Structure formats: structure tokens, C-alpha cells
Amino acid sequence: MNESTLSIKQLADMLRQDARDLEKMASRGYLPARRVGGEWTFATAEIHEWLEKRLPDYSDDELSRLDSSHAPSNDLLVCSMLAQDSIELDLHARTRTSMLHEMVKIAERSWQIWDPQALLASLREREQRSTTAVANGVAFPHPARRLPDALGESVVAFARMAEPLNLGAADNRTTDLVFMVACRNDATHLQVLARLSRLIMREELMDALRVATSPRAIWDLLAEAE
């Protein structure tokens, strides 16, 4: 077993689920899996893509299990990666491509982006697979794969769009709040997406983010919510 694959036990630990339930899901084709030497193995990239597609439909309890799988759930996770300098309140972008380009520039203000071109290319690759827009007018653009050599530390950047974009969200709503997530490893990546997915369930928080008047106010709202 290597970093590109997971055993049934590793997957059970990651998802906080019973291994027997996962075996049933794999045998019924609900999970992307392969039999190797009589044992189920799971490609890490396939599992993460499978999870990303299902996160919007997860309950708060299910998200909480993912959220707390690698660190205490009451820790400031998103805000520990979100510099106030990487918060933009009036982002002008008319296309998905220009939005991604601007998000990389916003993330660069953290001084943790070592290879912005590699990050941008991977963001575009991920968007070509399927939209990262979710419900409630929010999008979570992120690289197609983790880029440890392109980042000093894991980074979150936030932007509120000057004009909402149609990014193809399942609820047909345009997107006006964007959280770009760029993590150095898969575990942190999933935890951040789970935490953000929980946060956007809070309508009062989303309403407050849409009227906040400063980057500090945005950061404080998110920190209080975490």
C-alpha cells in the first residue's frame, strides 16, 4: 500500500465509518474500488473525487466526522489558513477563468504561494472535471491534486464577487462567495472542505458575509462560526 492507494482500514479511519459497511459499499459498486490479492484497495484520488461530489449532500453529523478526523473540531481550521490580506470584498470577474486567475492573485497575498502558475493550472484542470460551485451561492475552487511543492503552507482565500457568476451549481443559483482552498496534503484538504460545507449551512453566517464591510469583519465572522 502506498500514498496513492488506501486499504479498507485506512479508508474506514479517514471516513470514520465501519470497515464492514465500506466493504458492502465497495462490493455493490457504490465506492470506487478494486480487488487486489483478495483485498479491497481504493485509489486516493478517486476516493477524494467521490467524496467531493457527495459533500454537499452530507448531513452536519456526517460532515462533523470528516471535519474532526484529523484535529479537534473546535480548532480554528479555515481561519488558520485565511490571512486577512487574502480576503477580497469586491472581486470583478466575468468568467470562471478570470475568477480563478484573480483568486490565485488574492491567495498570493498570503506569501505562501510559491508557484502561482502551477496552482492556476491545477485549479483549471479541476474545474474542467466538474464545477466546484455548491449550494447557497458558494464555490470552493481547489486544485485537481495536492501541490506541496507549490505551497509554503496550506492556504484559503476568500472573495465576494462584485457581480455573481453562473458556475453551474446544482441548485441553479449564481455564485457570489468564493473560498479557494489549496492544501499541502489530502487529509487537510478534506477536513477544510468538510468544515466549509458545515459553515455554509448557516444562513445567518452567509447573510452576514454578504454585507460585511471589511476583511477583518469577514475573518471575525468565520472565526466565531468555527
Q: Which residue stretches match the model-derived regions?
A:
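Cytosolic covalent-transfer regions centered on His/Cys nucleophiles
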Residues: M1-E226
